[in-house]
Regions:
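Generic detection of intrinsically disordered/low-complexity segments and helix-coil linkers/edges
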Residues: 9-10, 20, 37, 64, ...
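Well-ordered alpha/beta subsegment
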Residues: 55-97
């Protein structure tokens, strides 16, 4: 499962799965080193870098805005990684290819 970055953010891996590429660009956040979706938070990412949390998972309330700020700061890098495997664009858009 592709990680967006080699390092964790607040102790969470940020990643997506090969099953995820059928949806719009999004980010899972999980402490689980096996990157299972169970317990993972899920954020759909808009074209401006803002995100919408769809599932909180095991994230604590105070961690949510920190993860969202990180996504906003790095969303273009993350999107480039996403596009290596997916034809789908940002949340609310149609396929980019």
């Amino acid at each position: 499962m592709p990680k967006y970055f080699a390092e964790k953010v607040l102790g969470h891996w940020l990643y997506f799965t090969t099953h995820c590429i059928l949806e719009a660009m999004h980010v899972h956040a999980s402490r689980d080193s096996k990157l299972r979706e169970k317990g993972a938070a899920k954020f759909f990412v808009y074209a401006d870098g803002s995100s919408r949390m769809m599932v909180q998972g095991t994230l604590r309330d105070h961690e949510v805005p920190v993860i969202q700020a990180f996504i906003k700061q790095h969303y273009l890098e993350m999107f480039a990684k996403w596009q290596e495997l997916s034809d789908n664009g940002f949340y609310g858009e149609t396929a980019s290819r």
